[in-house]
Design a protein with these regions (language model features):
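N-terminal low-complexity, intrinsically disordered segments
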Residues: 40-106
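An exposed acidic His-Trp-rich patch
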Residues: 124-174
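Compositionally biased, intrinsically disordered low-complexity segments enriched in Pro/Arg/Gln/His
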Residues: 14-17, 23-25
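Intrinsic disorder
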Residues: 2-16, 32-33
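Generic structural signal for well-ordered, non-transmembrane alpha-helical segments
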Residues: 105, 109, 151, 176-183
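Mixed-charge, glycine-accented linear interaction segment located at domain edges/termini
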Residues: 159-214
């Protein structure tokens, strides 16, 4: 993302607007401004997850968009383009995009769906059988890859260097943070776009993936 695009990250319940520079699609240092959550128990290591996004000025929403009446397809594929990242802030590593055209609401929506897909085994965190899911990007052949074993989820991407290990979080943490990210993102977008808060698709989305207790 070229310097000057607006990136949004959260810390606690506060939201910040910061200027960031993203030139390459890489696994890189995680940002210092972040919303965090942590659990302990995987080899006694604390894993701290931050999910964030930026909106790109290169791919603005179509003029005269009626956000109140926008359909699911428009909300997921045509609006709110930018970039996203998932970061392990303790290890200072993240999986991020840098295209500028990723529909960030669609990413948040799909991430919540994927977390549920990874929880189909009735044995839950006792299951040693791996469970897989992919997040596809519509304008690219690249994918973000998710693999769950027991209660832990490895996250990698096609564009990561082959020698780089995935970032890893507990499934419980990923579920909670994905939903927090979705609700924080919706709050940001409804602040920026008149009528979006009255869109029935947004109501349904919030009801489908409510926030979870810490």
């Amino acid at each position: 993302m070229p310097y000057g695009d607006v990136a949004t990250s959260s810390y606690g319940k506060r939201r910040h607007l910061v200027l960031r520079q993203r030139r390459y699609l890489v696994l890189r240092q995680a940002p210092s401004l972040c919303r965090t959550g942590s659990v302990t128990g995987h080899d006694t290591i604390d894993y701290v997850l931050d999910i964030g996004y930026s909106l790109s000025r290169r791919f603005p929403d179509p003029p005269q968009t009626d956000y109140r009446r926008a359909g699911v397809r428009d909300l997921r594929h045509d609006l709110f383009c930018g970039d996203v990242y998932l970061a392990d802030t303790k290890a200072d590593r993240e999986v991020s995009t840098a295209w500028g055209w990723v529909p960030v609401l669609d990413f948040a929506w799909a991430l919540c769906d994927i977390v549920e897909q990874l929880d189909q085994d009735p044995r839950g965190s006792r299951s040693a059988k791996p469970q897989f899911a992919e997040l596809d990007f519509t304008e690219s052949t690249d994918r973000m890859l998710f693999e769950r074993r027991f209660g832990w989820v490895d996250i990698a991407a096609d564009w990561m260097p082959v020698e780089e290990p995935p970032i890893t979080f507990s499934h419980r943490l990923l579920r909670r943070e994905a939903r927090d990210f979705l609700h924080d993102l919706i709050a940001d977008l409804t602040d920026m776009h008149d009528g979006l808060a009255d869109n029935p698709a947004i109501w349904d989305l919030q009801a489908r993936f409510p926030r979870l207790p810490s």
